[in-house]
Amino acid sequence: MRKEDCFYLGKIAKKFSFKGEVLVYLDTDEPEMYEDLESVFVEVNKNLVPFFIENSNLHKADFLRVRFEDVDNEEEADAIMNCEVYLPLKMLPKLTGNKFYFHEVIGFEIEDKRVGVFGKIVSINDTTAQPLFEVLNGEVEMLIPMIDHFIVKIDRENKKVVMDLPEGLVEMYL
């Protein structure tokens, strides 16, 4: 399985028991969707390795307590500590309307109602308080806030995000 064909689910955060159980931090708004997984991909030495789940249940708000097959003690759990966890993209529920997954709009054109098409989305910066579209217009990199009421339409068919941005925001980059 290639990383490009997967989505980031979370990270193995800490050991839970001396029998190899671990807590996986789930980077999701709906952790209950992932309570009954049969397997996940764990990134070990830059390779996605399938890990089969013997048992799992939610632990507190954002953690999944997991017992993997063939991880039977603390030493084996240590070997996968802090590793990232992935699932195949096909496991994501389809979104419609103006709801979208960040990875889904990478490569889409971005258009403002007044200015027209002004670039292509190359990345999403979600390390800030407000996620940002990272847009490339020729050599110019632009940061456009991903605010719901700015988004007019996610046009999946034409691979375009249409926005109604505050006057001057796009122009300050051009």
Swiss-Prot record:
<dbReference type="InterPro" id="IPR002676">
    <property type="entry name" value="RimM_N"/>
</dbReference>
<dbReference type="InterPro" id="IPR036976">
    <property type="entry name" value="RimM_N_sf"/>
</dbReference>
<dbReference type="InterPro" id="IPR056792">
    <property type="entry name" value="PRC_RimM"/>
</dbReference>
<dbReference type="InterPro" id="IPR009000">
    <property type="entry name" value="Transl_B-barrel_sf"/>
</dbReference>
<dbReference type="GO" id="GO:0005840">
    <property type="term" value="C:ribosome"/>
</dbReference>
<dbReference type="Pfam" id="PF01782">
    <property type="entry name" value="RimM"/>
</dbReference>
<dbReference type="GO" id="GO:0043022">
    <property type="term" value="F:ribosome binding"/>
</dbReference>
<comment type="similarity">
    <text>Belongs to the RimM family.</text>
</comment>
<feature type="domain" description="PRC barrel">
    <location>
        <begin position="97"/>
        <end position="169"/>
    </location>
</feature>
<keyword id="KW-0143">Chaperone</keyword>
<keyword id="KW-0698">rRNA processing</keyword>
<dbReference type="InterPro" id="IPR011961">
    <property type="entry name" value="RimM"/>
</dbReference>
<keyword id="KW-0690">Ribosome biogenesis</keyword>
<comment type="subunit">
    <text>Binds ribosomal protein uS19.</text>
</comment>
<dbReference type="GO" id="GO:0005737">
    <property type="term" value="C:cytoplasm"/>
</dbReference>
<protein>
    <recommendedName>
        <fullName>Ribosome maturation factor RimM</fullName>
    </recommendedName>
</protein>
<dbReference type="GO" id="GO:0042274">
    <property type="term" value="P:ribosomal small subunit biogenesis"/>
</dbReference>
<dbReference type="GO" id="GO:0006364">
    <property type="term" value="P:rRNA processing"/>
</dbReference>
<dbReference type="Pfam" id="PF24986">
    <property type="entry name" value="PRC_RimM"/>
</dbReference>
<keyword id="KW-0963">Cytoplasm</keyword>
<comment type="function">
    <text>An accessory protein needed during the final step in the assembly of 30S ribosomal subunit, possibly for assembly of the head region. Essential for efficient processing of 16S rRNA. May be needed both before and after RbfA during the maturation of 16S rRNA. It has affinity for free ribosomal 30S subunits but not for 70S ribosomes.</text>
</comment>
<dbReference type="InterPro" id="IPR011033">
    <property type="entry name" value="PRC_barrel-like_sf"/>
</dbReference>
